[in-house]
Curated annotation (Swiss-Prot):
Quaternary structure, from the entry: Component of the condensin-2 complex, which contains the smc2 and smc4 heterodimer, and three non SMC subunits, ncapg2, ncaph2 and ncapd3 that probably regulate the complex.
Pfam families: CNDH2_C, CNDH2_M, CNDH2_N
Compositionally biased tracts (Acidic residues): 269-279
Keyword tRNA-binding appears in the UniProt entry: no
Annotated family: Belongs to the CND2 H2 (condensin-2 subunit 2) family.
Chief place where the protein resides: nucleus
Functional note: Regulatory subunit of the condensin-2 complex, a complex that seems to provide chromosomes with an additional level of organization and rigidity and in establishing mitotic chromosome architecture.
InterPro entries xrefs: CNDH2_C, H2_M, H2_N, Ncaph2
Protein name: Condensin-2 complex subunit H2
One GO process term, biological-process aspect: embryonic body morphogenesis
Record's keyword terms, sorted: DNA condensation, Nucleus
Disulfide bonds, paired cysteine numbers: none
Length: 624
C-alpha cells in the first residue's frame, strides 16, 4: 500500500510548475498499471481478490491533468519562440531617424514650394463628345435620383418631446412619431402610405374608375401586360403625382388622367394595326435620329383623344371579370312589411287547432255612419268632411271614387241621365230634411279626378259600392262633440274593447273552481271587513257589567243569549282574560259529556285589572 501511495503521489498532488510535468512519463505509468490489471483475477472468493476502482480513477484523472499541463507548456513555448524571432528582426533593422533628427521615411521635397490651385483644364467637355448607341439597342433603365420619403426620416429629439409616451411610473418610453401608424396615412387597400400628397381614399376610388374608362377606350391596340399594369396601378395609387419615367419605346399611350390633355408613351412595345402604322414609323425615325445626336430622349406626348370616342364605346358584357376586384357596394334598402288583418290571417290554412274567433272587421261605411252621425247634431253648423284625422283620408278616398264613377256614368249615359239624376237629387233633398246644402266648391279637386280623359276606360270597372246608392246616400261627415276630449275618447274605446273581449275569454276547470271560491268567500270576507275591531278590555267590561253584585253566579249561556257566533267567541276570550286577572271565577260540572255547556262565571271584583296596573306601586317603593 505504501508502495502504491509513493508511486502515485504526483497524480494526487498536481505539480504547479509546468516544466516539471515533462519529467513524468504518463505513458509508462499507464502501461504498468494496465499490466497489473491484467494479472488481477476477479473471483467470488469472499472478497480476497479485489480491484481498487478509486485508484484507477485517480490514475486516469492525474494522467489527464499532467498531459494537459504538458500541452499548455508547449503552447507557451511556441509563442515565446515567435516573439523572440520577431524582436530579433526588428533589432536588426536600422533606425529611420538619422543623427540630425530627420526621418528618412518621410519626404519633404516640395516643402518650400508655393501652394497652387487645382487646375481644371484637364476636364473634358462632355458637349464635344457623342455617345455611340447601336440602332437595335433600346435603353430601358433610367437612373433616377433616390429621394428618401419624409416619413422614413427619423424625427429629431425636440420633436419627440412634444408628445411623449410615458409609463405608469412616469418614465418616458417612446414618442408618438416612433410608430408608423401615427405618421402614415391608411389606404383603402389596407397599406400605410408614407406620404399623403393630397391623396384621399375617395380620390383612390375615382382614380380606379378613370383608369377603367381609359382602358376601355384604349382597347386591344394599347394593351399593357397584366404584371406591369398591376405594378403601375399600385404606384399611381400611392402617389398623387407619379414621376414620369423616360421612354424609349416605339408606341403611343393613352391620355393622362390628370386633366392636362397630354400623356406619355407606354413602356411596352406592341404592334398597331390600321392607319396608325404610318404615323408610328415617323415617330420611330424621329426618335432614332434624336437618340444618335443627344444620347437620350424623353417620351413623346400624344394628342388627347376626343371624349366622344370614350363615351360611345360600351363595355363588353361577356368579358371576364377580375376575381380580385372589389364589387360595387349597394346601399341597404329596407323593404315594406305588411301585416294581414286578423280576419284575413285566420282564413289561411294552418295545422294548429285553435278556436276561430269571429272577425272583428266590419264595413267601414256602416261604422263611420254609426260613430260620426247623430241626429241631434244634424242641425248644427258642420265643416266639410270629418274632423277625425285618422278617418279623413278614407273619407275623401271614398268620395273621390264616387265622383269619378259618377262623371264616367254621365259621359256614357248623356244629358238624359243628368236630368234624371238632378230630379232624384231634388227629391232626396225634400225627403231628407237633415241633409244640408254644401258649398259650390265642396268636391272640387285639382287632381286626376277632374280630368275626364283619365277615366274613359272605366266603363265596367265601377266600384260596386257606388251602384248601391240607397246604402251610401245618407252618409254625411260630422264633427265630434266639443266637450269630448282625447282622454275620454280613449277611455271609452278601452271600455268598449274590454266589454267585447269578455265573451271570448276561455274558461277552464281551474278558472271555474276559482270563480266558485270567489263567489263563496267574497260575501264572507266583505262581512268580516264590516265588523268592528276586537278590543279584549272593552268586551271584558261589557261582561262584568252584566253582573249585579260581587259573588253572583251566572251561566255563560245566559250571558251570551241573542249574540252572534263571532261575538260569543270574543266574549269567551274576554272571560278567560278576566279569570286570569282574578276578576271572575270559572266553574263547570265534572265529566266530559256532563260538563258540556255548563260553564258558569262568578264575579270576584268589580275593579278593572288593567286600571289597577296604572295606579300600582311596588311594596319596596311604597314603604319608603
Amino acid at each position: 500500500m505504501d508502495d502504491a501511495e509513493s508511486r502515485f503521489t504526483h497524480l494526487l498532488q498536481p505539480i504547479r510548475d509546468l516544466t516539471k510535468n515533462w519529467e513524468v512519463d504518463v505513458a509508462a505509468q499507464l502501461g504498468e498499471y494496465l499490466e497489473e490489471l491484467d494479472q488481477i483475477c476477479i473471483s467470488f472468493d469472499g472478497g480476497k481478490t479485489t480491484m481498487n476502482f478509486a485508484e484507477a480513477a485517480l490514475l486516469i484523472q492525474g494522467s489527464a491533468c499532467i498531459y494537459s499541463k504538458k500541452v499548455e507548456y508547449l503552447y507557451s513555448l511556441v509563442y515565446q519562440a515567435l516573439d523572440f524571432i520577431s524582436n530579433k528582426k526588428r533589432d536588426q533593422q536600422p533606425a529611420s531617424v538619422g543623427a540630425d533628427g530627420v526621418d528618412k521615411d518621410a519626404t519633404f521635397a516640395h516643402r518650400n514650394d508655393e501652394e497652387e490651385f487645382l487646375s481644371l483644364d484637364d476636364i473634358i467637355d462632355p458637349k464635344k463628345t457623342n455617345v455611340d448607341i447601336k440602332k437595335d439597342q433600346v435603353l430601358h433603365v433610367v437612373n433616377i435620383v433616390p429621394l428618401t420619403p419624409m416619413a422614413l426620416v427619423p424625427p429629431e429629439e425636440t420633436e419627440k418631446k412634444n408628445n411623449p409616451l410615458c409609463s405608469r411610473k412616469g418614465e418616458v418610453l417612446a414618442s408618438r412619431k416612433d410608430f408608423r401608424m401615427n405618421t402614415c396615412t391608411p389606404h383603402p387597400s389596407g397599406a400605410f402610405m408614407l406620404e399623403l400628397a393630397g391623396k384621399s381614399p375617395m380620390q383612390f376610388l375615382q382614380h380606379i374608375q378613370h383608369h377603367e374608362e381609359a382602358s376601355l377606350a384604349q382597347g386591344e391596340q394599347n394593351a399593357i401586360p397584366e404584371g406591369e399594369n398591376d405594378n403601375m396601378e399600385a404606384e399611381k395609387s400611392d402617389c398623387a403625382d407619379p414621376v414620369q419615367v423616360l421612354q424609349f419605346s416605339d408606341e403611343g399611350a393613352p391620355a393622362a388622367e390628370n386633366g392636362d390633355g397630354a400623356g406619355f408613351l407606354p413602356l411596352d412595345d406592341h404592334d398597331e394595326a390600321g392607319d396608325g402604322e404610318v404615323e408610328q414609323a415617323e415617330h420611330i425615325e424621329r426618335r432614332k435620329m434624336q437618340t444618335e445626336e443627344r444620347g437620350y430622349v424623353l417620351r413623346e406626348r400624344l394628342e388627347q383623344k376626343p371624349a366622344s370616342a370614350i363615351k360611345n364605346e360600351t363595355s363588353d358584357p361577356w368579358c371576364g371579370l377580375d376575381p380580385f376586384e372589389s364589387c360595387e357596394e349597394k346601399p341597404f334598402k329596407k323593404g315594406k312589411h305588411y301585416t294581414l288583418p286578423r280576419g284575413i290571417a285566420e282564413d289561411l290554412s294552418s295545422n294548429k287547432r285553435k278556436r276561430k274567433l269571429p272577425c272583428k272587421l266590419q264595413d267601414f261605411m256602416k261604422w263611420f255612419s254609426s260613430t260620426h252621425w247623430d241626429g241631434s247634431e244634424a242641425m248644427k253648423s258642420r265643416r266639410k268632411g270629418p274632423t277625425f284625422a285618422d278617418m279623413e283620408v278614407l273619407y275623401w278616398k271614398h268620395i273621390k271614387e264616387r265622383m269619378t264613377a259618377q262623371r264616367q256614368l254621365h259621359r256614357r249615359m248623356g244629358a238624359q241621365f243628368v236630368k234624371e239624376v238632378t230630379l232624384l237629387n231634388q227629391e232626396e233633398e225634400l225627403v231628407n230634411p237633415l241633409e244640408e246644402p254644401r258649398d259650390a266648391d265642396y268636391l272640387d279637386y285639382d287632381g286626376p279626378a277632374d280630368d275626364a280623359s283619365d277615366h274613359e276606360d272605366l266603363g265596367e270597372n265601377i266600384p260596386a259600392c257606388l251602384r248601391e246608392e240607397p246604402a251610401l246616400g245618407d252618409i254625411e261627415p260630422v264633427t265630434l262633440h266639443d266637450q269630448l276630449s282625447y282622454e275620454e275618447l280613449v277611455r271609452r274605446n278601452v271600455e268598449l274593447f274590454m266589454a267585447n273581449s269578455q265573451k271570448y275569454a276561455q274558461e277552464t276547470v281551474l278558472s271555474l273552481r276559482v270563480r266558485e271560491w270567489e263567489d263563496k268567500m267574497g260575501p264572507q270576507l266583505q262581512e268580516q271587513e264590516e265588523r268592528g275591531a276586537f278590543d279584549i278590555h272593552d268586551y271584558g267590561d261589557r261582561l262584568t257589567a252584566q253582573f249585579s253584585k260581587v259573588g253572583e253566579w251566572r251561566s255563560f249561556a245566559s250571558l251570551m243569549a241573542d249574540k252572534e257566533p263571532y261575538e260569543v267567541c270574543r266574549y269567551m276570550l274576554a272571560s278567560l282574560q278576566l279569570a286570569n286577572d282574578y276578576t271572575v271565577e270559572v266553574s263547570q260540572k265534572p265529566g266530559l259529556h256532563e260538563g258540556l255547556d255548563t260553564m258558569a262565571l262568578r264575579l270576584l271584583s268589580q275593579q278593572k285589572a288593567h286600571e289597577r296596573f296604572k295606579t300600582y306601586t311596588a311594596p319596596s317603593i311604597s314603604q319608603q
